[in-house]
Protein backbone atom coordinates (compact mmCIF):
# COMPACT_ATOMS: atom_id res chain seq x y z
CA UNK A 1 0.00 0.00 0.00
CA UNK A 2 1.43 3.39 -1.03
CA UNK A 3 1.00 6.01 1.65
CA UNK A 4 0.86 9.73 1.03
CA UNK A 5 3.66 11.77 2.57
CA UNK A 6 1.27 13.03 5.25
CA UNK A 7 0.02 9.52 6.10
CA UNK A 8 3.62 8.35 6.49
CA UNK A 9 4.52 11.31 8.68
CA UNK A 10 1.39 10.85 10.80
CA UNK A 11 2.21 7.18 11.35
CA UNK A 12 5.77 8.03 12.41
CA UNK A 13 4.59 10.91 14.58
CA UNK A 14 2.22 8.59 16.46
CA UNK A 15 5.09 6.13 16.84
CA UNK A 16 7.11 8.86 18.57
CA UNK A 17 4.19 9.52 20.91
CA UNK A 18 3.90 5.80 21.59
CA UNK A 19 7.60 5.51 22.39
CA UNK A 20 7.46 8.56 24.67
CA UNK A 21 4.46 7.13 26.54
CA UNK A 22 1.88 9.70 25.45
CA UNK A 23 1.56 12.81 23.33
CA UNK A 24 1.85 14.92 26.48
CA UNK A 25 5.13 13.24 27.39
CA UNK A 26 6.42 13.72 23.85
CA UNK A 27 5.61 17.43 24.10
CA UNK A 28 7.50 17.69 27.40
CA UNK A 29 10.44 15.78 25.93
CA UNK A 30 10.60 18.27 23.06
CA UNK A 31 10.56 21.30 25.34
CA UNK A 32 6.92 22.35 25.03
CA UNK A 33 5.25 23.77 28.14
CA UNK A 34 1.90 22.25 27.09
CA UNK A 35 0.94 19.55 24.55
CA UNK A 36 -1.51 21.79 22.68
CA UNK A 37 0.74 22.38 19.66
CA UNK A 38 1.29 18.66 19.13
CA UNK A 39 -2.42 17.86 19.47
CA UNK A 40 -3.14 20.47 16.81
CA UNK A 41 -0.43 18.99 14.60
CA UNK A 42 -2.01 15.55 14.94
CA UNK A 43 -5.42 16.98 14.09
CA UNK A 44 -4.07 18.72 10.98
CA UNK A 45 -2.20 15.65 9.75
CA UNK A 46 -5.33 13.53 10.15
CA UNK A 47 -7.39 16.02 8.14
CA UNK A 48 -4.79 16.20 5.35
CA UNK A 49 -3.81 12.53 5.33
CA UNK A 50 -5.50 11.71 2.01
CA UNK A 51 -4.21 14.81 0.22
CA UNK A 52 -1.05 13.98 -1.77
CA UNK A 53 -0.23 17.70 -2.03
CA UNK A 54 -0.51 18.47 1.70
CA UNK A 55 2.59 20.05 3.21
CA UNK A 56 2.81 17.65 6.15
CA UNK A 57 5.15 18.50 9.01
CA UNK A 58 7.23 21.60 8.38
CA UNK A 59 11.00 20.90 8.18
CA UNK A 60 11.93 22.93 11.28
CA UNK A 61 9.41 21.08 13.45
CA UNK A 62 10.44 17.75 11.95
CA UNK A 63 14.06 18.48 12.86
CA UNK A 64 13.04 19.43 16.41
CA UNK A 65 11.02 16.24 16.94
CA UNK A 66 13.82 14.07 15.55
CA UNK A 67 16.50 15.82 17.61
CA UNK A 68 14.71 15.51 20.95
CA UNK A 69 13.73 11.87 20.39
CA UNK A 70 17.16 10.78 19.18
CA UNK A 71 16.03 9.94 15.66
CA UNK A 72 18.28 10.48 12.63
CA UNK A 73 17.60 13.35 10.27
CA UNK A 74 14.72 12.57 7.92
CA UNK A 75 13.37 9.72 10.08
CA UNK A 76 9.85 11.16 10.21
CA UNK A 77 9.67 11.24 6.42
CA UNK A 78 10.74 7.63 5.81
CA UNK A 79 8.89 4.32 5.85
CA UNK A 80 9.95 1.97 8.65
CA UNK A 81 9.40 -1.64 9.49
CA UNK A 82 6.59 -2.34 11.93
CA UNK A 83 7.86 -3.33 15.35
CA UNK A 84 6.19 -4.59 18.48
CA UNK A 85 6.01 -2.31 21.46
CA UNK A 86 7.48 -3.95 24.59
CA UNK A 87 4.77 -5.38 26.81
CA UNK A 88 5.87 -3.38 29.84
CA UNK A 89 5.59 -0.15 27.90
CA UNK A 90 2.19 -1.11 26.55
CA UNK A 91 0.96 -1.93 30.05
CA UNK A 92 2.25 1.26 31.62
CA UNK A 93 1.32 3.77 28.96
CA UNK A 94 -1.10 2.18 26.50
CA UNK A 95 -0.79 2.90 22.80
CA UNK A 96 -0.29 6.42 21.54
CA UNK A 97 -3.82 6.40 20.14
CA UNK A 98 -5.27 5.45 23.53
CA UNK A 99 -3.32 8.16 25.31
CA UNK A 100 -4.38 10.74 22.75
CA UNK A 101 -8.02 9.71 23.02
CA UNK A 102 -7.91 10.21 26.78
CA UNK A 103 -7.05 13.89 26.33
CA UNK A 104 -8.61 14.75 23.01
CA UNK A 105 -11.98 13.83 21.61
CA UNK A 106 -12.44 11.96 18.37
CA UNK A 107 -13.16 15.26 16.67
CA UNK A 108 -9.86 16.82 17.72
CA UNK A 109 -8.17 18.44 20.67
CA UNK A 110 -10.66 19.49 23.33
CA UNK A 111 -8.15 19.83 26.16
CA UNK A 112 -6.01 22.96 26.39
CA UNK A 113 -3.89 25.02 28.75
CA UNK A 114 -3.76 28.82 28.52
CA UNK A 115 -1.37 31.11 30.35
CA UNK A 116 -2.07 34.83 30.78
CA UNK A 117 0.32 37.10 32.63
CA UNK A 118 -0.13 40.82 33.32
CA UNK A 119 1.06 43.23 35.99
CA UNK A 120 -2.22 42.54 37.81
CA UNK A 121 -2.64 38.76 37.52
CA UNK A 122 -0.69 35.64 36.58
CA UNK A 123 -3.11 32.92 35.50
CA UNK A 124 -2.93 29.37 34.16
CA UNK A 125 -6.18 27.72 33.06
CA UNK A 126 -6.44 24.12 31.88
CA UNK A 127 -9.76 22.69 30.68
CA UNK A 128 -11.02 19.45 29.19
CA UNK A 129 -14.41 19.86 27.53
CA UNK A 130 -14.86 16.08 27.57
CA UNK A 131 -13.99 15.67 31.22
CA UNK A 132 -15.75 14.28 34.27
CA UNK A 133 -16.53 17.47 36.20
CA UNK A 134 -13.36 17.72 38.27
CA UNK A 135 -11.86 21.02 39.34
CA UNK A 136 -8.68 22.21 41.01
CA UNK A 137 -8.91 25.87 41.87
CA UNK A 138 -6.35 28.12 43.55
CA UNK A 139 -7.34 31.76 43.06
CA UNK A 140 -7.39 33.33 46.50
CA UNK A 141 -11.11 34.12 46.07
CA UNK A 142 -13.02 31.30 47.82
CA UNK A 143 -16.57 32.20 46.75
CA UNK A 144 -15.56 32.56 43.10
CA UNK A 145 -13.91 29.14 43.35
CA UNK A 146 -17.16 27.73 44.76
CA UNK A 147 -19.03 29.10 41.74
CA UNK A 148 -16.50 27.90 39.14
CA UNK A 149 -16.69 24.46 40.72
CA UNK A 150 -20.41 24.50 39.83
CA UNK A 151 -19.49 25.09 36.17
CA UNK A 152 -17.14 22.11 36.24
CA UNK A 153 -19.49 19.73 38.06
CA UNK A 154 -22.63 20.58 36.10
CA UNK A 155 -20.85 21.08 32.79
CA UNK A 156 -18.86 17.83 33.08
CA UNK A 157 -15.82 19.92 32.21
CA UNK A 158 -12.50 19.49 33.97
CA UNK A 159 -11.23 22.90 35.06
CA UNK A 160 -7.84 23.62 36.64
CA UNK A 161 -7.15 27.26 37.51
CA UNK A 162 -4.16 28.77 39.27
CA UNK A 163 -4.16 32.53 39.76
CA UNK A 164 -2.01 34.99 41.65
CA UNK A 165 -3.73 38.36 41.59
CA UNK A 166 -3.50 41.77 43.24
CA UNK A 167 -5.94 40.83 45.99
CA UNK A 168 -4.41 43.48 48.26
CA UNK A 169 -6.38 45.94 46.10
CA UNK A 170 -9.60 43.94 45.64
CA UNK A 171 -10.97 40.94 43.75
CA UNK A 172 -11.84 42.84 40.56
CA UNK A 173 -8.80 42.08 38.39
CA UNK A 174 -8.71 38.46 39.55
CA UNK A 175 -12.37 37.77 38.76
CA UNK A 176 -12.28 39.56 35.40
CA UNK A 177 -8.99 38.06 34.24
CA UNK A 178 -10.01 34.53 35.20
CA UNK A 179 -13.10 35.02 33.04
CA UNK A 180 -10.92 36.25 30.17
CA UNK A 181 -8.51 33.31 30.41
CA UNK A 182 -11.29 30.76 30.80
CA UNK A 183 -12.96 32.24 27.72
CA UNK A 184 -9.72 31.93 25.75
CA UNK A 185 -9.41 28.30 26.82
CA UNK A 186 -12.99 27.48 25.77
CA UNK A 187 -12.44 29.05 22.37
CA UNK A 188 -9.19 27.17 21.76
CA UNK A 189 -10.62 23.86 22.96
CA UNK A 190 -13.62 24.16 20.62
CA UNK A 191 -11.40 24.53 17.55
CA UNK A 192 -13.44 24.79 14.35
CA UNK A 193 -16.65 23.77 16.21
CA UNK A 194 -17.54 21.16 13.62
CA UNK A 195 -20.14 18.68 14.83
CA UNK A 196 -21.07 20.49 18.04
CA UNK A 197 -24.64 21.30 19.03
CA UNK A 198 -23.73 25.02 19.23
CA UNK A 199 -26.79 26.00 21.29
CA UNK A 200 -27.34 25.22 24.95
CA UNK A 201 -29.89 26.21 27.57
CA UNK A 202 -30.77 25.35 31.14
CA UNK A 203 -33.17 26.27 33.93
CA UNK A 204 -31.85 25.57 37.43
CA UNK A 205 -33.76 26.07 40.71
CA UNK A 206 -32.42 26.21 44.25
CA UNK A 207 -35.19 26.60 46.81
CA UNK A 208 -36.77 30.00 46.07
CA UNK A 209 -34.24 30.94 43.36
CA UNK A 210 -34.57 30.11 39.66
CA UNK A 211 -32.22 31.08 36.83
CA UNK A 212 -32.16 30.56 33.07
CA UNK A 213 -29.02 30.56 30.92
CA UNK A 214 -28.97 30.33 27.11
CA UNK A 215 -25.76 29.98 25.06
CA UNK A 216 -24.97 30.28 21.36
CA UNK A 217 -21.39 29.43 20.36
CA UNK A 218 -21.88 31.70 17.39
CA UNK A 219 -18.55 33.45 17.13
CA UNK A 220 -20.36 36.71 17.96
CA UNK A 221 -19.71 37.87 21.53
CA UNK A 222 -22.63 39.34 23.41
CA UNK A 223 -23.82 39.28 27.01
CA UNK A 224 -27.36 39.97 28.19
CA UNK A 225 -27.20 39.96 31.99
CA UNK A 226 -30.34 40.32 34.08
CA UNK A 227 -29.64 39.68 37.76
CA UNK A 228 -30.83 41.90 40.59
CA UNK A 229 -28.97 40.56 43.59
CA UNK A 230 -30.70 41.08 46.92
CA UNK A 231 -27.48 42.25 48.53
CA UNK A 232 -24.15 43.68 47.40
CA UNK A 233 -21.85 41.19 49.10
CA UNK A 234 -21.91 37.43 49.51
CA UNK A 235 -19.53 37.00 52.39
CA UNK A 236 -16.73 39.33 51.29
CA UNK A 237 -17.32 38.86 47.55
CA UNK A 238 -18.69 41.81 45.57
CA UNK A 239 -21.56 40.47 43.43
CA UNK A 240 -20.87 43.11 40.74
CA UNK A 241 -17.80 41.07 39.81
CA UNK A 242 -19.92 38.22 38.48
CA UNK A 243 -20.86 40.39 35.51
CA UNK A 244 -17.17 41.21 34.91
CA UNK A 245 -16.37 37.50 35.04
CA UNK A 246 -19.01 36.64 32.45
CA UNK A 247 -18.00 39.57 30.22
CA UNK A 248 -14.50 38.09 30.19
CA UNK A 249 -15.79 34.66 29.18
CA UNK A 250 -18.11 36.02 26.50
CA UNK A 251 -15.65 38.38 24.84
CA UNK A 252 -12.85 35.83 24.63
CA UNK A 253 -14.80 32.65 23.90
CA UNK A 254 -16.82 34.51 21.25
CA UNK A 255 -20.17 33.25 22.55
CA UNK A 256 -23.58 34.87 22.90
CA UNK A 257 -24.79 34.47 26.48
CA UNK A 258 -28.15 35.34 28.03
CA UNK A 259 -28.38 35.13 31.83
CA UNK A 260 -31.68 35.73 33.61
CA UNK A 261 -32.31 35.27 37.30
CA UNK A 262 -36.07 34.75 37.30
CA UNK A 263 -36.59 34.69 41.06
CA UNK A 264 -34.67 34.61 44.30
CA UNK A 265 -34.33 36.21 47.71
CA UNK A 266 -31.09 34.62 48.90
CA UNK A 267 -28.12 36.10 47.00
CA UNK A 268 -26.09 32.92 47.43
CA UNK A 269 -28.92 30.92 45.87
CA UNK A 270 -29.23 33.43 43.04
CA UNK A 271 -25.54 33.13 42.18
CA UNK A 272 -25.45 29.36 42.50
CA UNK A 273 -28.41 28.82 40.18
CA UNK A 274 -26.76 31.04 37.57
CA UNK A 275 -23.46 29.18 37.63
CA UNK A 276 -25.09 25.75 37.66
CA UNK A 277 -27.29 26.73 34.72
CA UNK A 278 -24.27 28.12 32.86
CA UNK A 279 -22.40 24.84 33.33
CA UNK A 280 -25.33 22.78 32.09
CA UNK A 281 -25.99 25.06 29.11
CA UNK A 282 -22.30 25.00 28.18
CA UNK A 283 -22.26 21.21 28.41
CA UNK A 284 -25.16 21.03 25.95
CA UNK A 285 -23.62 23.55 23.54
CA UNK A 286 -20.17 21.93 23.31
CA UNK A 287 -21.43 18.36 22.98
CA UNK A 288 -20.94 16.60 19.67
CA UNK A 289 -24.16 15.77 17.85
CA UNK A 290 -23.67 12.47 15.97
CA UNK A 291 -26.35 13.50 13.49
CA UNK A 292 -24.25 16.49 12.47
CA UNK A 293 -21.60 14.07 11.16
CA UNK A 294 -18.83 16.61 11.66
CA UNK A 295 -20.60 19.43 9.86
CA UNK A 296 -20.52 23.03 11.04
CA UNK A 297 -23.90 24.00 12.61
CA UNK A 298 -24.28 27.15 10.54
CA UNK A 299 -25.54 28.00 7.05
CA UNK A 300 -22.42 30.19 6.71
CA UNK A 301 -20.27 27.08 6.85
CA UNK A 302 -18.14 28.49 9.66
CA UNK A 303 -18.46 29.69 13.26
CA UNK A 304 -14.93 31.03 13.52
CA UNK A 305 -14.75 33.70 10.80
UniProtKB/Swiss-Prot annotation:
EC class of the enzyme, as a word: lyase
Gene3D superfamilies reported in the protein's UniProt record: Imidazole glycerol phosphate dehydratase, domain 1
Catalysed reactions, as listed in the record: D-erythro-1-(imidazol-4-yl)glycerol 3-phosphate = 3-(imidazol-4-yl)-2-oxopropyl phosphate + H2O
Cellular component terms per the entry's GO annotation: cytoplasm
Keywords, ordered alphabetically: Amino-acid biosynthesis, Cytoplasm, Histidine biosynthesis, Lyase
Subcellular compartments: Cytoplasm
GO BP annotations, alphabetical order: L-histidine biosynthetic process
Main location group: cytoplasm
Superkingdom of the organism of origin: Bacteria
UniProt keyword annotation of Hydrolase present: no
Pathway annotation: Amino-acid biosynthesis; L-histidine biosynthesis; L-histidine from 5-phospho-alpha-D-ribose 1-diphosphate: step 6/9
E.C. numbers: 4.2.1.19
Sample GO molecular function, one term: imidazoleglycerol-phosphate dehydratase activity
Pfam families given in the database record: IGPD (PF00475)
Family: Belongs to the imidazoleglycerol-phosphate dehydratase family.
Name of the protein in its database record: Imidazoleglycerol-phosphate dehydratase
Top-level taxonomy: Bacteria, Pseudomonadati, Pseudomonadota, Betaproteobacteria, Neisseriales
Amino acid sequence: MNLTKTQRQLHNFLTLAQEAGSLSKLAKLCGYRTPVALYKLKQRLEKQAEDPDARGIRPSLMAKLEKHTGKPKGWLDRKHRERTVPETAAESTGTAETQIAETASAAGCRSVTVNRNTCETQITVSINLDGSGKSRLDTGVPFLEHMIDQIARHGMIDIDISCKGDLHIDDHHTAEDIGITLGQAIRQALGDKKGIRRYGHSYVPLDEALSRVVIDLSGRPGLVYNIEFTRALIGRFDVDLFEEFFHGIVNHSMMTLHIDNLSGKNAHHQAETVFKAFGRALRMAVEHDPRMAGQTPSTKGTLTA
